[in-house]
Amino acid sequence: MRLPKGIYGITDDSYNVKNHVDAAKVFLEGGVRIIQYRRKEGSIRQMLNEAKEIRKLCNQYGAVMIVDDRVDIAVLSDADGVHVGLEDAPVDEVKRRFSGIIIGASASTVDEAKEGEKAGADYLGAGSIFPSPTKPDYRILGLEGLRRVVQSVSIPVYAIGGVTLESIPAIKATGAWGAAVISGILAAKDPLEMAKRFVKAWDEA
């Protein structure tokens, strides 16, 4: 499955949306075509119910659905893939046990990017590019660091961390496949309108 270029929406329920499903709907209606369901707390039943709802929405819009961390939820909800962080399940083990699903890996250095690709990741989330309210303790990679990561691997790289509307042209100029956004869209007064603006900014950059 070809990964969509451009804006990569990550769900959250702590901003100007009702819940994770509503966040996914905002992204999709705004033109985003890859969605990550990212819930850190909650029961398996709750996560699975939300994931299945998001799966239905993604099907309606022809979008790719990724689940953060939880391989079990990804498989049970029929998601297209799973994103595993540096502290999560090893990429190669997930790849071996669940062939056929998209696997994303996190990277904050060139070495981590190369390791992720070697382990079998289908794409990378590289960052934090800028200081981020979602991940305040993360190492800052910066635009030049992002460029080095992009040049060090042959798989798609999505920039993540502190991405703003104004930073989209500079991120695209590094050769990144796309940019992951959470608060930049969901914390806006009008998240749907902001999603549309992010998508347009990428397309026109």
Swiss-Prot record:
One Pfam match: TMP-TENI
Presence of keyword Magnesium: yes
The reaction(s) this protein catalyses: 2-[(2R,5Z)-2-carboxy-4-methylthiazol-5(2H)-ylidene]ethyl phosphate + 4-amino-2-methyl-5-(diphosphooxymethyl)pyrimidine + 2 H(+) = thiamine phosphate + CO2 + diphosphate; 2-(2-carboxy-4-methylthiazol-5-yl)ethyl phosphate + 4-amino-2-methyl-5-(diphosphooxymethyl)pyrimidine + 2 H(+) = thiamine phosphate + CO2 + diphosphate; 4-methyl-5-(2-phosphooxyethyl)-thiazole + 4-amino-2-methyl-5-(diphosphooxymethyl)pyrimidine + H(+) = thiamine phosphate + diphosphate
GO molecular function: magnesium ion binding; thiamine-phosphate diphosphorylase activity
Record-listed Mg(2+) binding positions: D69, D88
Residues that, per the record, bind 2-[(2R,5Z)-2-carboxy-4-methylthiazol-5(2H)-ylidene]ethyl phosphate: S132, P133, T134, G162, I182, S183
A GO-annotated cellular component: cytoplasm
Stated name of the protein: Thiamine-phosphate synthase
